[in-house]
Amino acid sequence: MLVDRVENNEKQQQQMASSSDAMSDSSLSDDEIIEHVVHGKEPKSTYELSWVSNAIAWSGALVWPLMLTVPLLLSSMYSPISYRQVFPESWYVYDTLSNCAPKPLGLVLGILAVAVGQVFVWIFFYLFKFGYLGTDPRSIQSKGAREYIFREGLLTHIGQPEGFVLLIGYLAITWMLKLMPQSYYSFEGTIQYKELFMCLVLQDGIQYTMHVLEHIVSPAFYQMSHKPHHRFTNPRLFDAFNGSLMDTFCMIIIPLFVTANLVRHCNVWTYMAFGSSYACWLTLIHSEYVFPWDGIFRKLGLGTPADHHVHHKFFKFNYGHLFMWFDQLGGTYRDPSGFAPRVFRENV
């Protein structure tokens, strides 16, 4: 009997030891190993852990609808903060045929829409950059992402006079001087998604053309306008609007004005949605990291950070920003995978 007990104890110890070794080889936590060995509970498989991690990472995709927070909440009749309930009628009813100056409410809300969208982008990027969304981010370039203090990057992004300061000035002048089509001053309805899509495509198409011209018109003009932005050959998210006043005027202001006068039937909510989604997307494609949705975006021809890194690294490819369609048509598109692993990481 004693011999049988000793043999049984030895077998149990061997089983526990082998289980412990197997657990340590599977990269499980100490708590999970204890639960398995002592209490007989099965740990989560690598697949389950991977699925959970991916799901958390993909939760960052909520940043896309959150860009439209202000126009969605204020324009919906079902919203508790619908503009009709929040603002007096005299603040938004405006006779476009009169000689009176436009009401500034639409302008203020438009700037607010962009600001709120940007805040959601910053929050998402902070959580993503520091690994709070399931996994540590992968840098696009093989040499790794630039190191910087997040607060410094954010303050640099906000404080660029050629960025938000110039854009706010443009919005104020065109709105208050009635340089926009009449429908843009209307608060009726909600976001018009067809017109929103048309604005984004036209804006990027015109911006693509201006971008190419900035590169080829003359070396002197390039040095004055676009070269300051191209000093970032390994850009970070906060470099999006870091350039020159001339660059912003040529590549953003002119396309914005032309787009507004081509897509002439937007209401104020669509204009807000366009401004916010455009500014946020332009910011995101300067990211130094790969986002979970980049693979899907690339299959659809939508702009990703890796696509834009190709332009910053080589200068003569991928002039588009939001869409790669114009580069594909013009023969200037290059897939980031073509430069891996020497310049870019695999599968970016």
Swiss-Prot record:
Motif (Histidine box-1): 211-215
Region ranges (Disordered): 1-26
Subcellular location: Endoplasmic reticulum membrane
Motif Histidine box-3 boundaries: 308-312
Coiled coil start-end: none
Positions with biased composition (Basic and acidic residues): 1-10
Domain note: The histidine box motifs may contain the active site and/or be involved in metal ion binding.
Name listed for the protein in its UniProt record: Alternative squalene epoxidase
Species lineage: Eukaryota, Sar, Stramenopiles, Ochrophyta, Bacillariophyta
